[in-house]
Structures are given as structure tokens and as C-alpha cells.
């Protein structure tokens, strides 16, 4: 690798989340600010909501008031 063209790597970079959580990592930046982390993300906290949007066929059936028995 060529010398003098790569950014300086910092081993102790503080990552600050909007929820107040902080942790350290390595990066070429001196400080990182993130909006969401593993302490506040719904997937990791277990507070996620499952949304069943349904498919295009279900939307069509609902639009024309059909049921599975009506269609062969």
C-alpha cells in the first residue's frame, strides 16, 4: 500500500446514540453520532410490531367483497 494516502485509524472512538447510550469502536472519525442503536432499536428490545400488510390478491378480494369460496 502507498504511504501517506490512507486516513488515520482511531481505535477508541466514542459512539453516541440519541437515546443516551455510548460505546467505543474503531473508525477513521474521531466521534460518531447515531440515531438508533441496539439498546433502543425495537428488534433488539423485543418491542417490535408485526404488521401484516397482506398481498395483492387479498387486496383485490377485499375490494370486490369476494371470499375464497366464491373464486374457483
UniProtKB/Swiss-Prot annotation:
Keywords attached to this entry: Metal-binding, Ribonucleoprotein, Ribosomal protein, RNA-binding, rRNA-binding, Zinc
Binding locations of Zn(2+): 17, 19, 37, 40
Domain of life: Bacteria
GO molecular-function terms, A-Z: metal ion binding; rRNA binding; structural constituent of ribosome
Cofactor note: Binds 1 zinc ion per subunit.
Bilayer-spanning residue ranges: none
GO biological process assignments: translation
Pfam families: Ribosomal_L31
InterPro entries: Ribosomal_bL28/bL31-like_sf, Ribosomal_bL31, Ribosomal_bL31_A, Ribosomal_bL31_sf
Residue runs in coiled coils: none
One GO CC term, this protein: ribosome
Tagged with keyword Zinc: yes
Cofactor(s) of this protein: Zn(2+)
Quaternary context: Part of the 50S ribosomal subunit.
Function: Binds the 23S rRNA.
Similarity-based family: Belongs to the bacterial ribosomal protein bL31 family. Type A subfamily.
The protein, known as: Large ribosomal subunit protein bL31
Gene: rpmE
Amino acid at each position: 500500500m502507498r504511504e501517506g494516502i490512507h486516513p488515520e485509524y482511531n481505535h477508541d472512538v466514542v459512539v453516541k446514540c440519541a437515546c443516551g447510550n455510548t460505546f467505543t469502536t474503531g473508525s477513521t472519525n474521531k466521534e460518531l453520532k447515531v440515531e438508533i442503536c441496539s439498546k433502543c432499536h425495537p428488534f433488539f428490545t423485543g418491542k417490535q410490531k408485526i404488521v401484516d400488510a397482506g398481498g395483492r390478491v387479498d387486496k383485490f378480494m377485499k375490494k370486490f367483497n369476494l371470499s375464497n369460496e366464491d373464486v374457483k
